[in-house]
Amino acid sequence: MASSWRLILFLSFTSCLSEYSEALSGLSTSYAALLRIKKSSTSSAFGSKSRPRYSSPSLGTLSVSPPSWRGAAQQYHSPVNLYHSPDAFRQDESVDYGPVFVQEPDDIIFPTDSDEKKVALNCEVRGNPSPTYRWLRNGTEIDLESDYRYSMIDGTFIINNPSESRDSGLYQCLATNTFGSILSREATLQFAYLGNFSGRTRSAVSVREGQGVVLMCSPPPHSPEIIYSWVFNEFPSFVAEDSRRFISQETGNLYISKVQTSDVGSYICLVKNAVTNARVLSPPTPLTLRNDGVMGEYEPKIEVHFPTTVTAAKGTTVKMECFALGNPVPTITWMKVNGYIPSKSRLRKSQAVLEIPNLQLDDAGIYECTAENSRGKNSFRGQLQIYTYPHWVQKLNDTQLDSGSPLQWECKATGKPRPTYRWLKNGAPLLPQSRVDTANGVLAIHSVNQSDAGMYQCLAENKYGAIYASAELKILASPPSFELNQVKKSIIVTKDREVLIECKPQGSPKPAISWRKGDKAVRGNKRIAILPDGSLRILNASKADEGKYICQGVNIFGSAEIIASVSVKEPTRIELTPKRTELTVGESIVLNCKAMHDSSLDVTFYWTLKGQPIDFEKEGGHFESIRAQASSADLMIRNILLMHAGRYGCRVQTTADSVSDEAELLVRGPPGPPGVVIVEEITESTATLSWSPATDNHSPISSYNLQARSPFSLGWQTVKTVPEVITGDMESAMAVDLNPWVEYEFRVVATNPIGTGDPSIPSRMIRTNEAVPKTAPSNVSGGSGRRHELVIAWEPVSEEFQNGEGFGYIVAFRPNGTRGWKEKMVTSSDASKFIYRDESVPPLTPFEVKVGVYNNKGDGPFSQIVVICSAEGEPTAAPTDVTATSVSVSEIFVVWKHVKESLGRPQGFEIGYWKDTEPEDSAETVRTRGNESFVMLTGLEGDTLYHLTVRAYNGAGYGPPSREVSATTKRHPPSEPPGNLRWEQQGSQVSLGWEPVRPLANESEVMGYKVFYRQEGHSKGQVIETQKPQAVVPLPEAGVYIIEVRAYSEGGDGTASSQIRVPSYAGGKITSAQSTLHSLSKWSSVTLLLALMLPSSSW
């Protein structure tokens, strides 16, 4: 219910705002030459007040947030500048601060007919301690006890049963805590109502046809704005506005520029309150035509126009009305004198209303409307002036000052007209005094004291609005204290160094500083100085400077002291050896750091590499710090890498000083990678490359090695170069023996006496130029195929060796013993076979064959000549002695003999078979390969007559079929399973018995039975055959056995019986008829029960 209520509230609220916005956007200028300025939906400012709240009769008071310019008046200042955001206050309740507005009261329009009968003016303030609230109406504080209708919850002021006569006015919230008070903006409470029209009958208006007329609305008392419309004759027939009819949204009057006979009737003025939506109707005004003729033509007479001076706020929308009576009906036009009407402007109601949204300063100027017809024209001019609400440029910040210090606060705001400034202290006007000046937004207090502490507000206002900025002033007054700035009680330095003893006591006013050594005052000289912040500095310290130093801070509220003891020690010296060392990658070294120091001081050693501390745990065991003696330390570097080269630092730290020394370590290693590799020139088999030298890593580069990679290589391969050996001082070379028309990328590797470095970044991918192919096809062979065909096959040339585009093959062949070659072109680079067909070529004719290559650059070499025979002929002899034997219900075994041939050697045999009830051309076929002369046909139908033929085949085709033979498949095995299966288990065997299976008429006779048994959990079982309906099954191992029985016949195995589960048990006897288990003393009854009850898996 709660969520539904909130939804209804939200929809009603948005509906109210939408209707209110529509009502306002429809208002315009008046018959009385007045201007109406209404809010734009995107406007950030609305009059001189914040946007009002509206009270719904059913939902109570509704509040609309104030516009953005109003938000500038609400300042969030952190006390003594300790916080950067207002939210920080909520997180630290220990900080005390003055009041800060969270929400200020909004303007409210309260409908007099509201069912709520309650008005709430909201005010919320933060502060620590929590603020208290008071309210003012029209500048006078409200006594909550003076009227039973008043109440306050937190800071919200509530008026029950509000009355326009007693409660309308300007309200302000005053919030106070121990730091002072702040005053909110003025919020207006006004009441919305709509009275009734006078009930007096209105006189008829009689005009001549063609004459203009004005029908007066004379609205009843109302607040605030109302919206006008007119009803013609009866509701809801409304007067439609056009170039001839116009309704002024200022006076509500209806203007008809030229009356027609269709206008005769009764007119009623309908007014609607923009807030309450209440509507009332006026008495009807009859409009009649006189019978003394038609009105002649006359020039326009402007009846509605805007004022001579129009003022409007920046960002709002202005609407200017202009309408004229005349015959013919006048046309209205608009212009801006000495300028152009803004492009964003819109003309409404047949150009009678000029609407300019989102007003800007450059929209100001003189506007003119002109009414014109064939009899003449009339114009009217007025000036549009744009004003702006105050807007902050510079606000106030919370401030704390020492007593006696000067204060200067400045607030700046823009606006048109230019804003004036007023100052408030604790909610009351601040007037100039002997120490206080206020002028042009500047507040100056020449010497602050505790009475000046409090909450201050700067008020910037012009005739259209006001904004507030608030800040807190704290006056500090306290004796000197060192609690927040503690000083080291013992200071140790070395000779000839600087001593700095800080002395920064907190206090207000700022304490005066003095120093003593023992009981003698410290006087400044060339070595000793008291700095502006109170600290004592001693240069070139010596033993004579040792002792206790006392700093004293004094102000009018008291004094405080600190004592620091100074000790002067001998300076520390350090030596790091060896100073410069050259090593090779993989070697080790020890750096020794020795310190000479004051014996009363402890020393600590720190090691650095290239200015950064060495992390001994993250360096992979390369570094180890060894402390053999109190005054020395060693750095062990093992298995040195190139990255370990650089300047090593040893720093010795005592409580008095810190000294350091450095040593340089050079590491020789393999070269770094050469720079960018550039391909400068390309031919069909070479590429000229250049590169920038590699880093030699302190060992001269002896040679470079060129490597290449292509789509056909296994990774990077070293290539031959010119010169053959690329010395370390060279930066270019030529890669040779490359394959034409292949994409390559190159890299360079440098070598020095220590080793080979990392390769360079690969060059860009390049392709060598095209060339005539040089590689002939390999493995030329052939044979087989169909009769009269010569089949030639070869291994295709890899793309790597095709050497260019347009690659193909030239197939040349000639009968063995002849001289002329016949050549055929094969254009596919992937081709591996060519078939030449000639009906005159006898089977197995030998041919000499060679295969060559070509591309766009020319012809390449041929392969070696090989001899290939043409295809053999089809088999000519039919298989003999074909027999077909039925094996089972679905199988027939076929056997034949074949005759050897010289020109038609079979590759295999094809057996065709079909049912007796089907034609031969529907035959299915099975093929064999090679010299096999038998086949088992499977998947046949039982008890069915099949016809069969056999024929040989090879690549040339099929031979003649054998004579037709026939065979009938066996009848189906019995479909009835063995029934009434009985068993008796004794020891390690089980005796079975069952009822004999009797086959149906279309089933084969039972030849015997098969008993299938297996141990549970095993997939493989055993079979026992028997001709009788009984059997003995051995159970060799302990466990549970699964047993089933099938009848078998010449048609195969029949349907299986239901499975039984039999336990193998050495003691006792179990039968399938037993229903109790009491005799099984050694058998687990639970196990046996499970064995008998659980279902078994099928075979």
UniProtKB/Swiss-Prot annotation:
Residues 673-771, 776-873, 878-972, 977-1067 form the Fibronectin type-III domain. Residues 958-983 are annotated as: Disordered. Keywords: Cell adhesion, Cell membrane, Disulfide bond, Glycoprotein, GPI-anchor, Immunoglobulin domain, Lipoprotein, Membrane, Repeat, Signal. It is found in: Cell membrane. Its main location: membrane. Residues 1-18 form the signal peptide. SUPFAM superfamilies: Fibronectin type III, Immunoglobulin. Residues 99-190, 196-282, 300-385, 390-474, 480-569, 571-660 form the Ig-like C2-type domain. The keyword Membrane applies. One of its GO terms (cellular component) is side of membrane. GO terms for molecular function: cell-cell adhesion mediator activity. SMART domains: FN3, IG, IGc2. Specifically expressed in the nervous system. Expressed in cerebrum and cerebellum but at low level in spinal cord. In brain, it is expressed in highly restricted regions at postnatal day 7, such as the auditory pathway, including the cochlear nucleus, superior olive, inferior colliculus, medial geniculate nucleus and auditory cortex. Expressed in the accessory olfactory bulb, glomerular and mitral cell layers in the olfactory bulb, anterior thalamic nuclei, layers II-IV of the cerebral cortex, dentate gyrus of the hippocampus and external granule cells and Purkinje cells of the cerebellum. Residues 1073-1099 form a propeptide. It is a lipid-anchor; GPI-anchor. Contactins mediate cell surface interactions during nervous system development. Has some neurite outgrowth-promoting activity in the cerebral cortical neurons but not in hippocampal neurons. Probably involved in neuronal activity in the auditory system. This is Contactin-5. It comes from Rattus norvegicus (Rat). The lineage of its organism: Eukaryota, Metazoa, Chordata, Craniata, Vertebrata. The gene is Cntn5.
